[in-house]
């Protein structure tokens, strides 16, 4: 039976973000306590480093060091917190496998939505200027280096927020990880960055709940973030 595009989209959303593959596997009490302590310390340090990194002047080489330090905080906190699972996703045939293709599609869909929204943002100077300032790090720096750091940070953030932090929360993990992820960007002073973090955080948290692991969220995040870095500047330039 051939389904229409709307039915296909509904089935995709259900498989990617709604219907869990398997029941979660909680940590033993001692391991959970350790995870929570490591996660709490890492969150405070990471939020401070992120606020510092986003306030560094575009073109300053210190930005690279700061963002690499941030990736190290998230990744180290995640690894030290305990075991992290890759997770499994649903396939079109009802089987289970690593959610690679599904996550690439989800990241691409998320990217498309943001790029359409950027056409609106570009027409509002008070919203556009902070975004331009953030993108100046790529314009005035080395794009390949910034792209590499962007991917690295995306992986590290997912290891921490949808890996360690999610596993440390017994209840409401989707809501709490989304809110905390968004709050870490408040120090940037860029409202649209906070909004983007909330949306991406919610999507990847739902994906974490469905797949039971970090692989899907990692692929979705880096597909979106790398795409935004490469495609957002030319999209904004369309309406200059």
Question: Model features per residue range: what roles?
Answer:
Residues 1-98, 229-240:
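N-terminal, membrane-interfacial amphipathic/helix-forming hydrophobic leader that caps
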Residues 36-43, 99-100, 114, 126-130, ...:
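Short acidic/polar alpha-helix capping motifs at helix-coil junctions
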Residues 40-44, 68-71, 103-115, 146, ...:
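Alpha-helical transmembrane spans of integral membrane proteins, capturing the lipid-embedded, hydrophobic core
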Residues 49-52, 65-66, 73-81, 112, ...:
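Residue-level signal for alpha-helical transmembrane segments in multi-pass membrane proteins
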Residues 51-55, 82-86, 114, 118-122, ...:
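Membrane-water interface at transmembrane helix exits
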Residues 60-67, 97, 135-144, 190-191, ...:
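Juxtamembrane helix-entry segments on the extracytoplasmic side of multipass membrane proteins
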Residues 86-153, 238-239:
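Juxtamembrane helix-loop-helix connectors linking adjacent transmembrane helices
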Residues 139-240:
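Transmembrane helix-loop-helix hairpins at the membrane interface
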């Amino acid at each position: 039976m051939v389904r229409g595009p709307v039915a296909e989209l509904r089935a995709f959303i259900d498989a990617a973000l709604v219907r869990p593959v398997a029941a979660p596997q909680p940590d033993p009490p001692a391991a959970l306590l350790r995870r929570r302590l490591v996660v709490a310390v890492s969150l405070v340090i990471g939020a401070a480093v992120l606020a510092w990194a986003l306030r560094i002047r575009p073109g300053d080489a210190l930005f690279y060091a700061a963002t690499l330090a941030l990736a190290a905080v998230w990744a180290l906190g995640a690894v030290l917190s305990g075991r992290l699972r890759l997770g499994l996703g649903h396939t079109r045939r009802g089987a289970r496998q690593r959610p690679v293709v599904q996550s690439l599609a989800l990241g691409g869909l998320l990217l498309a939505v943001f790029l359409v929204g950027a056409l609106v943002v570009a027409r509002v100077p008070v919203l556009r200027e902070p975004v331009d300032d953030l993108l100046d790090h790529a314009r005035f720096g080395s794009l390949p280096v910034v792209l590499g750091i962007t991917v690295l940070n995306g992986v590290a953030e997912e290891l921490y927020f949808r890996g360690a932090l999610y596993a440390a929360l017994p209840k409401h993990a989707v809501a709490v990880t989304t809110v905390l992820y968004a709050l870490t960007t408040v120090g940037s002073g860029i409202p649209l960055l906070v909004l983007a973090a909330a949306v991406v955080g919610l999507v990847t948290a739902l994906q974490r709940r469905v797949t039971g692991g970090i692989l899907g969220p990692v692929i979705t995040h880096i597909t979106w973030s790398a795409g935004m870095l490469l495609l957002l500047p030319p999209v904004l330039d369309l309406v200059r």
